[in-house]
């Protein structure tokens, strides 16, 4: 079966694993999923990310992060730009998620960046997702 939106599938798998408090999540690898996972790690939303190479496309192993009392670090993830409706932001109109408490993941000419990094580099791009 052909998947029309692998990014939405990736975000949904993270959301579902987070809801039931799984420690580890494995998803089929792709370059954009690797980029999103690395941003989540860099911003402190997940503990660690491993890329496991195999004979096929590879697997991304995401280690989810929880607080001391088991509270979720990722409250929600939302896909913004979809295959049927692409959403772009100019460098001056970069979105802020919950007044800076969350992040927007932006696909730019310089690769995947957070909204803050895109503002610093003065670039716009496609708004992939919001994470808070």
From Swiss-Prot:
InterPro entries in alphabetical order: Ribosomal_uS8 (IPR000630), Ribosomal_uS8_CS (IPR047863), Ribosomal_uS8_sf (IPR035987)
UniProt cross-references to Pfam families, sorted A to Z: Ribosomal_S8
Keywords: Ribonucleoprotein, Ribosomal protein, RNA-binding, rRNA-binding
MF (Gene Ontology): rRNA binding; structural constituent of ribosome
Gene Ontology biological process terms from the UniProt entry: translation
Entries under SUPFAM superfamilies matching the protein: Ribosomal protein S8 (SSF56047)
One GO cellular component term noted in the UniProt record for this chain: ribosome
PANTHER family: 40S RIBOSOMAL PROTEIN S15A
HAMAP family named in the record: Ribosomal_uS8_B
Role according to the record: One of the primary rRNA binding proteins, it binds directly to 16S rRNA central domain where it helps coordinate assembly of the platform of the 30S subunit.
Family label: Belongs to the universal ribosomal protein uS8 family.
Subunit organization: Part of the 30S ribosomal subunit. Contacts proteins S5 and S12.
Name of protein: Small ribosomal subunit protein uS8
Organism (species): Streptococcus pyogenes serotype M49 (strain NZ131)
Taxon lineage: Bacteria, Bacillati, Bacillota, Bacilli, Lactobacillales
């Amino acid at each position: 079966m052909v998947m029309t939106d692998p990014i939405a599938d990736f975000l949904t798998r993270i959301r579902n694993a987070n809801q039931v408090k799984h420690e580890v999540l494995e998803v089929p690898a792709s370059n954009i999923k690797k980029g999103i996972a690395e941003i989540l790690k860099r911003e402190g939303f997940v503990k660690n990310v491993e890329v496991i190479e195999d004979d096929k496309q590879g697997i991304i192993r995401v280690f989810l992060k929880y607080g001391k009392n088991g509270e979720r670090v990722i409250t929600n993830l939302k896909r913004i730009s979809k295959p049927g409706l692409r959403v772009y932001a100019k460098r001056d109109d970069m979105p802020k998620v919950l007044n800076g408490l969350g992040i927007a993941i932006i696909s730019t000419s310089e690769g995947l960046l957070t909204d803050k990094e895109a503002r610093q580099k003065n670039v716009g791009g496609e708004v992939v997702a919001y994470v808070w």
